[in-house]
Amino acid sequence: MEADFAQLEFRVAAFLSQDALAMSEITSGFDVHSYTAKVISDAGQATTRQEAKEHTFAPLFGATGYGRTPSEASYYHHFIEKYEGIAAWHKKLGNEAVRFQKITNVGGRQYAFPNTERRPNGLPTNFTMIKNYPVQGFATGDVVPVVLVELENRLMPMRSTLVNSVHDSMVIDIHPYETEQVIEIINSMNMDLNQIIYDNYKVKMNVPLLLEAKIGPNWLDTQDV
């Protein structure tokens, strides 16, 4: 089984920025990748949902329309206009880095940005990293490790074993007679994820986290549970 966080960075960015639209889309199950494909296609470049995935969340990490086709670049401009809360949060982070030469994430981790200054265009130096670090730091530096530990603890009485993790995916070797039990563990963890974060960091997330599971005879040939 592969248990993979659904849109982890986007959910974390929505929480950290408290972007109302992003939070609404997450709770309603809005298909953001199909929307990205539509924006690019409407700009004149036919794009599938799969092709759009590489663009959907790229602006979260400082990517811009530079080096993209005109139709693709239109999405990057659209992202900033659509998610005003995320854009405002990015600006706030930039101001913090210029003023204090560091930024602090919600879990208390600090990222030093010495010699950060304002460029002639108004943007701070190191802006890509300034946008990126708080999201990646909380998502994969704080959330994923404690969930891995919790999953390992819940599997401990069983013969199924957590064997690997890659970024925000967890790979479980399931004993043939324990498939349903492991599925139930993942389902129960989905009910508890936000509480797990609070118990470890005293951070109360108002955006739901979600694990999506796939099962198969090997890591390549899997199907959604």
What residue ranges belong to the model's regions?
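Conserved catalytic core of nucleotide polymerization and phosphodiester-bond processing enzymes
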Residues: M1-V225
